[in-house]
């Protein structure tokens, strides 16, 4: 919950000027709902995609304060973050409720950025793979293979976000490899190999290159570093360097 519409617009202007017309790295910005209209106009003629931070599973109805997939589509939103760790922690979202949102998103031709990840307590208890496995399997129930081109998965080790603790490149890769294995079991090896799996555990300019060099880490779900255009663009540069 950061940035007013004016602040969001200024940030996107800076990102547009710094990223130029490069197309090698796909860039998506996900401002608060209140900033979507102004940011939509800013990215319309650029290579930057527009995403939202959440949505409701129902297309319409008496759900005060919620936003539907079609409302997002009307603002030219292409991506939507679903199941973020903060939504799970503070708003009680479950694997089942997140699954409903994921299906609603693809039915509206939105790209769900489907978030998974374990807490510190779960990691220290050795339950990481069990927790992440359940989140993937239950969160993607009835997901059609025909819509796999829309699916993006984001691994957020909750224990590494704003805690001072960090996941090593190897620790992150280990979970990403397991996630891809589970996706392979659900959708087949060939399909799983093409699904993007992002890392969302406090990626920043200092650690981006090492993380993005891992074979199963396909990008980043950037948190605090995205509030600075320089930090955000430095991460984009790190991504470009791994393609060289």
Can you say where each PLM-predicted feature lies in the sequence?
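Active-site loop-to-helix "anion-binding N-cap" substructures in soluble metabolic enzymes
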Residues: 1-244
């Amino acid at each position: 919950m950061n940035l007013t519409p004016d602040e969001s617009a200024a940030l996107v202007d800076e990102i547009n000027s710094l990223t130029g017309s490069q197309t090698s790295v796909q860039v998506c910005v996900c401002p608060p709902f209140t900033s979507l209209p102004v940011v939509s106009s800013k990215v319309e003629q650029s290579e930057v995609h527009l995403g939202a931070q959440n949505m409701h599973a129902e297309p319409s109805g008496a759900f005060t304060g919620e936003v539907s997939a079609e409302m997002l589509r009307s603002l030219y939103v292409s991506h939507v973050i679903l199941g973020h760790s903060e939504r799970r922690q503070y708003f009680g979202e479950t694997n089942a409720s997140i699954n409903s949102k994921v299906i609603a998103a693809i039915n509206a031709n939105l790209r769900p950025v489907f978030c998974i990840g374990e807490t510190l307590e779960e990691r220290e208890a050795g339950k990481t793979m069990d927790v992440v496995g359940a989140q993937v399997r239950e969160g993607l129930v009835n997901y059609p293979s025909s819509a796999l081109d829309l699916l993006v998965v984001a691994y957020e080790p909750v224990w590494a976000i704003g805690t001072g603790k960090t996941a090593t490149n190897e620790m992150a890769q280990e979970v990403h490899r397991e996630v891809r294995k589970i996706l392979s079991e659900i959708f087949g090896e060939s399909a799983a190999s093409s699904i993007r799996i992002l890392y969302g555990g406090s990626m920043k300019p200092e650690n981006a290159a090492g993380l993005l060099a891992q074979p199963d880490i396909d990008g980043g779900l950037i948190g605090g570093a995205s509030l600075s255009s320089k930090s955000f663009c430095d991460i984009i540069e790190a991504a470009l360097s791994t393609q060289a």
